[in-house]
Amino acid sequence: MAWIRSTCILFFTLLFAHIAAVPIKYLPEENVHDADFGEQKDISEINLAAGLDLFQGDILLQKSRNGLRDPNTRWTFPIPYILADNLGLNAKGAILYAFEMFRLKSCVDFKPYEGESSYIIFQQFDGCWSEVGDQHVGQNISIGQGCAYKAIIEHEILHALGFYHEQSRTDRDDYVNIWWDQILSGYQHNFDTYDDSLITDLNTPYDYESLMHYQPFSFNKNASVPTITAKIPEFNSIIGQRLDFSAIDLERLNRMYNCTTTHTLLDHCTFEKANICGMIQGTRDDTDWAHQDSAQAGEVDHTLLGQCTGAGYFMQFSTSSGSAEEAALLESRILYPKRKQQCLQFFYKMTGSPSDRLVVWVRRDDSTGNVRKLVKVQTFQGDDDHNWKIAHVVLKEEQKFRYLFQGTKGDPQNSTGGIYLDDITLTETPCPTGVWTVRNFSQVLENTSKGDKLQSPRFYNSEGYGFGVTLYPNSRESSGYLRLAFHVCSGENDAILEWPVENRQVIITILDQEPDVRNRMSSSMVFTTSKSHTSPAINDTVIWDRPSRVGTYHTDCNCFRSIDLGWSGFISHQMLKRRSFLKNDDLIIFVDFEDITHLSQTEVPTKGKRLSPQGLILQGQEQQVSEEGSGKAMLEEALPVSLSQGQPSRQKRSVENTGPLEDHNWPQYFRDPCDPNPCQNDGICVNVKGMASCRCISGHAFFYTGERCQAVQVHGSVLGMVIGGTAGVIFLTFSIIAILSQRPRK
């Protein structure tokens, strides 16, 4: 009966091999924190909850209102500012982060207050609001509870710079529909338009993507029905974006202040022009870099990724011929820094021998005025990954300099490619501390269920703290969204570091890979670690304590990770696919973790006058007052008793030409997305702002996952019991057969 024994051994070998290969997914019921303790809200929601009824929702006006057209309301740069100490530490850090966006993308600059008569003081009042233009006194911007997000702060600063909301333009009704009967009673004034005596479009088109545009559900009665929709339905998911400035926002800002230069962008090159951005070839090297286009088979640039015929250029250094150690130099023009630190970002790929090298150098002033002193900064080695990669190199130049790329051949006989460069950006900003690239993200998104997660590598900040991010491609809490969360990791420096680690600001960014950094609309979130971040899962201990004490051990990093703290609705899948977030199907995540304890006390005494919120105009009762000779109607405000006083409702006539109530005018928001129920397997459909979100059922043995509850999975413990029980029965059966087969025949 040797064949029976062999069969048994083979069967169980295959059985246990199969069990080891089957991925048993388990969704841990851990305590999940949300950085803002709930869903991120927009300005109108925050101000409504605070009981505020302001002009256009978030603007305070003086009695003698000056409009955007008045040149006397223009600021002189840099704008003096004060961060009041009633602001939270996280809000202060977020404001400074927003300042950097203005400096990088526009001519706007800020400086600490030093006794000037005109300045902005950022304070925490109720809600998010600002005044419009320079009032020539100290004036307020409120960053209240829930307002400490980069895009919201940028929005309020744009008001202070002189901008009203996009949908207040005179020609608004040509581009969007206002559904007056869906607006909260008494808040219709927020949707008024204003004539050219108050607002100018600066000769730019209507901008659906403007940071100053209302969101579809602003001031709505019904949570699932919008108040404003685009006449081109494709823009309904775009209006009210809260990522960053749009290209037209920046164009208007530059036109208003008659400037085009930025403060922290030193150099930028996509190699689309024949002059290769003023870069020069080395004269003492062995060969040159070649300016190539994407027309050749298999050669695709990073800027356009081969999407445009006859366009898409890059620099290439071939390493497939010649001799080992032959090199080529590519040098930038001479650059003049204003700060003491720069970040050189570029995309590169190496398709030749693993021994090929790409070296970044700087050429400095030799103290005689000649830029000739060479210093090696960083080396990149060839490998088996032939994809485009992002790189960051920290430079610390205080005088004029050039940066150089040196390509060196490693083993030409075993090379079939070379070294490629594209999309170079040099800024006077810090480089991101942690950079994580998730490749083939569309496939990752398709193959993961709600709650499945990916862990980043461990990064270290300048203090020596280990940290990382957790990516949930399909957020368990918010259907159709991606979740990102932060954690600290145990590391080699833990014994000498301070625990719990508090007052460190976390900035997580999903990179919009638009080649021009000024036009990037990356998605960023911030929070600051605090002793108030505790968890019942660890006996209400601070989650930022030493990870080896309060964290969980993970074999992939051979380290302990703390509980995650993050955002369940970091960015929607729809938005991810809209811009260049997934260029080359790569999701690129930046994460920073820096000490901002020094911002604890920032308020300074002031001189002269400062506006008080109680002395300003809110949206009051309105009277139609005809302007002589214009036939236009303007609003007359009345001063309320207090800042939070509500206003009486009024009847508002509908705008003309909004169109009949037909299907082509009413987007999907107006149809109940849960009728019919799109959820499978008895899933419950919930209408979340006009979008269907499925709540999948879960039993003792099985649970359903997927965006429509279409996938069934078995709880890991039950599956183990089933497999173990089945294996036991089979083993017992074969054992009985083997015993019976060995009994002597009569």
Swiss-Prot record:
Locations listed in the record: Membrane
Glycan-modified residues: 140, 222, 258, 414, 440, 447, 539, 630
Pfam families the UniProt entry points to: Astacin, EGF, MAM, MATH_2
Region (Disordered): 642-663
Membrane topology listed for this record: Single-pass type I membrane protein
Binding-site residues, Zn(2+): 155, 159, 165
GO cellular component terms given for this protein: extracellular exosome; extracellular space; meprin A complex; plasma membrane
Post-translational modification: N-glycosylated; contains GlcNAc, galactose, mannose and a small amount of fucose.
Domain named EGF-like: residues: 670-710
Subunit structure: Homotetramer consisting of disulfide-linked alpha subunits, homooligomer consisting of disulfide-linked alpha subunit homodimers, or heterotetramer of two alpha and two beta subunits formed by non-covalent association of two disulfide-linked heterodimers. Interacts with MBL2 through its carbohydrate moiety. This interaction may inhibit its catalytic activity.
Name of the protein described by the UniProt record: Meprin A subunit alpha
InterPro entries linked to this entry: ConA-like_dom_sf, EGF-like_dom, MAM_dom, MATH/TRAF_dom, Meprin, MetalloPept_cat_dom_sf, Peptidase_M12A, Peptidase_Metallo
Domain MAM: 264-433
Catalytic activity: Hydrolysis of protein and peptide substrates preferentially on carboxyl side of hydrophobic residues
Cofactor comment text: Binds 1 zinc ion per subunit.
Disulfide links within the chain: 107-259, 128-147, 269-431, 674-685, 679-694, 696-709
Residue span(s) of domain Peptidase M12A: 66-260
SUPFAM superfamilies named in the record: Concanavalin A-like lectins/glucanases, EGF/Laminin, Metalloproteases ('zincins'), catalytic domain, TRAF domain-like
Catalytic residue positions: 156
Activity modulation: Inhibited by several hydroxamate compounds, the most potent inhibitor is actinonin.
Cofactor: Zn(2+)
Example GO biological process: signaling receptor ligand precursor processing
